[in-house]
């Protein structure tokens, strides 16, 4: 990867001039000028995902300049470097090869001169065998009963991805009851233990190092609870499995290392659902559906690696997002899935994007002179319409939005889905074109009101419009489609980080708080007043000590 400051490129300067010259661009005018705008500014991927980006504040010239920026910052070399296993996570000296985890071809993928695919496929085969035993009931617990409950204990990438995907694929779910524990708050594990019984529960402890504080605290609590009921530590081996690389620690915990499923240091946490960390997904929906998830991601990988920038879905989404972030001054993006099964999708990419691109130091080690990662947030529709859409429609902040929806529902009850999609289609139209003062007045007149009666109310019912959106419509939410959608957003994040000249695959920002927490924890176990911090932190700790005494 070349370390190029994007603001110093000719394309960036051209984009600044282009923005200044087109600040008054109106979507209403762009559509009026070009009846074929939808055809020009939409793409279909794989025949079952439509990406309509026509309701954006862009012209063909805008896209040309954005593509020029990608070329001038040498995006191609960054893409090739990732797929070729180069150590593009330079601050940790690691390759970034989540694409290898879903490589469904015979193509070798090398890391440090070694093809990683034999090991990847061996772990997948081991996962498949384990899943089949658990799902079929062949695997028995310590009393001879089959497993009915699976509790995944992890945090961050070891939790958010499996939770989001198992929720999204609930229509494909088997009889196993899935539970997820992540928070070190004892309430999370306590409430989960109330829902299960020891005889029929399998615990998955998901920690690469088997030292993650939150995960191991919860795992030890679960183990102690289990042993107290089972009466014999030896029974742990039948009820606990590890998703880890630390065989010594796994064995010391009491887990049979035959039931340890490894992954590698080139797998980043927020990109790990494709690895052994995806075990709860495979257990929930079956291994065939897990493989379909991988297949969808693989097909998006191949599209991303080979399509021209002008026809490349992740690249176009990244460039359009960059246009708003760096030239329009937008500080956030909303992800709005009109599918209840996808209710954790925004939270998943909140981590995926903000942990990847929330950086203020460039790849040369210097402070950046431009904006980097946006704030990502969102909720499912139509709930969000009754919560925060007011600000998107009539607030003072520009918030580009991605709307996602399936054409076909897994639950075609009455007219629920047509009503849902009517709102999906209506929102992007309303955001783009708004409602003028003249339209508002005409509505009042049609309702029998005089303008004198309503003139004070008219300004409040005007919608400026010109609020940009992408519409991502897919035929149905299948494992394969979900895999493609996840990979699409992953690559969007990568493209933006590459152009911004930052490292997207480390996360040093999570470390300082953990270090200070490790320093503070022993102080909480003494009765003495604390004086070792600033006056605010001292005051908070000492108040806590007084209140808990």
Curated annotation (Swiss-Prot):
What residues sit in the active site? 355, 386, 514
Entry keyword annotation includes Isomerase: yes
Single GO MF descriptor: monosaccharide binding
Compartment annotation: Cytoplasm
**InterPro entries named in the record:** G6P_Isomerase (IPR001672), G6P_Isomerase_C (IPR023096), Phosphoglucose_isomerase_CS (IPR018189), SIS_dom_sf (IPR046348), SIS_PGI_1 (IPR035476), SIS_PGI_2 (IPR035482)
**Mind listing the UniProt keywords for this protein, alphabetically?**
Cytoplasm, Gluconeogenesis, Glycolysis, Isomerase
Q: Sorted alphabetically, which CDD domains does this protein's record hold?
A: SIS_PGI_1, SIS_PGI_2
The record's listing under Gene3D superfamilies reads:
1.10.1390.10, Glucose-6-phosphate isomerase like protein, domain 1 (3.40.50.10490)
Catalyses: alpha-D-glucose 6-phosphate = beta-D-fructose 6-phosphate
EC number annotated for this UniProt entry: 5.3.1.9
Give the main localization category. Answer: cytoplasm
The record's section on Pfam families has:
PGI (PF00342)
Question: What is its pathway?
Answer: Carbohydrate biosynthesis; gluconeogenesis; Carbohydrate degradation; glycolysis; D-glyceraldehyde 3-phosphate and glycerone phosphate from D-glucose: step 2/4
Q: Which GO terms describe its cellular component?
A: cytosol
> Which class of enzymes does this protein belong to?
isomerase
Listed under GO biological process in this entry are: gluconeogenesis; glucose 6-phosphate metabolic process; glycolytic process
Role according to the record = Catalyzes the reversible isomerization of glucose-6-phosphate to fructose-6-phosphate.
Q: Which family does it belong to?
A: Belongs to the GPI family.
Identify this protein by name. Glucose-6-phosphate isomerase
Q: Which organism is it from?
A: Aeromonas salmonicida (strain A449)
């Amino acid at each position: 990867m070349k370390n190029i400051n994007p603001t110093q490129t000719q394309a960036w300067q051209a984009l600044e001039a282009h923005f200044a010259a087109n600040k008054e661009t109106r979507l209403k005018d762009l559509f009026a000028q070009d009846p074929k705008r939808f055809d020009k500014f939409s793409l279909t991927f794989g025949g079952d995902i439509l990406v309509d980006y026509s309701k954006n504040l862009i012209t063909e010239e805008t896209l040309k300049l954005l593509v020029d920026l990608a070329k001038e910052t040498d995006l191609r070399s960054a893409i090739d470097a990732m797929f070729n296993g180069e150590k593009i996570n330079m601050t940790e000296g690691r390759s970034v090869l989540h694409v290898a985890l879903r490589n469904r071809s015979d193509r070798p993928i090398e890391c440090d001169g070694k093809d990683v695919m034999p090991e990847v496929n061996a772990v997948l085969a081991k996962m498949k065998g384990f899943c089949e035993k658990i799902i079929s009931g062949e695997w028995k617990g310590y009393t001879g009963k089959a497993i009915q409950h699976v509790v995944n204990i992890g945090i961050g990438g070891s939790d958010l991805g499996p939770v989001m995907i198992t929720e999204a694929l609930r229509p494909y779910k088997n009889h196993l009851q899935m539970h997820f524990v992540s928070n070190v708050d004892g309430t999370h594990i306590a409430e989960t233990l109330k829902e299960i019984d020891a005889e029929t529960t399998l615990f998955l402890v998901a920690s690469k190092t088997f030292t993650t504080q939150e995960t191991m605290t919860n795992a030890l609590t679960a183990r102690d609870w289990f042993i107290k009921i089972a009466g014999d530590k030896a029974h742990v081996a039948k009820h606990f499995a590890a998703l880890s690389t630390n065989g010594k620690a796994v064995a010391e915990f009491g887990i049979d290392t035959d039931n340890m499923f490894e992954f590698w240091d080139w797998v980043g946490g927020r990109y790990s659902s494709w690895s052994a960390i995806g075990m709860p997904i495979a257990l929930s929906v079956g291994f065939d559906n897990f493989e379909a998830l991988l297949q969808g991601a693989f097909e998006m990988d191949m599209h991303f690696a080979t399509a021209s920038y002008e026809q490349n879905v992740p690249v176009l989404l990244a460039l359009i997002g960059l246009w708003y972030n760096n030239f329009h001054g937008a500080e956030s993006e909303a992800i709005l899935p009109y599918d209840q099964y996808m209710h954790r999708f925004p939270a998943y990419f909140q981590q995926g994007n903000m942990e990847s691109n929330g950086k203020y130091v460039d790849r040369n080690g210097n402070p950046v002179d431009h904006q980097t990662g946006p704030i990502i947030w969102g909720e499912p529709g139509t709930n969000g319409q009754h919560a925060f859409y007011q600000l998107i429609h009539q607030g003072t902040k520009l918030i580009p939005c991605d709307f996602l929806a399936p054409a076909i529902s897994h639950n075609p009850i009455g007219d629920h889905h047509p009503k849902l999609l009517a709102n999906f289609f209506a929102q992007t139209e309303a955001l783009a074109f708004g409602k003028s003062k003249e339209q508002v007045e005409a509505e009042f007149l049609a309702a029998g009101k005089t303008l004198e009666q309503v003139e004070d109310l008219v300004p409040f019912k005007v919608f400026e419009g010109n609020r940009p959106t992408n519409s991502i419509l897919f035929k149905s939410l299948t494992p394969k489609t979900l895999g493609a959608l996840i990979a699409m957003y992953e690559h969007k994040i990568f493209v933006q980080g590459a152009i911004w000249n930052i490292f997207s695959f480390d996360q040093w920002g999570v470390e300082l708080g953990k270090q200070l927490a490790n320093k503070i924890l022993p102080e909480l176990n003494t009765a003495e007043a604390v004086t070792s911090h600033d006056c605010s932190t001292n005051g908070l700790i000492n108040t806590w000590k007084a209140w808990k005494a």
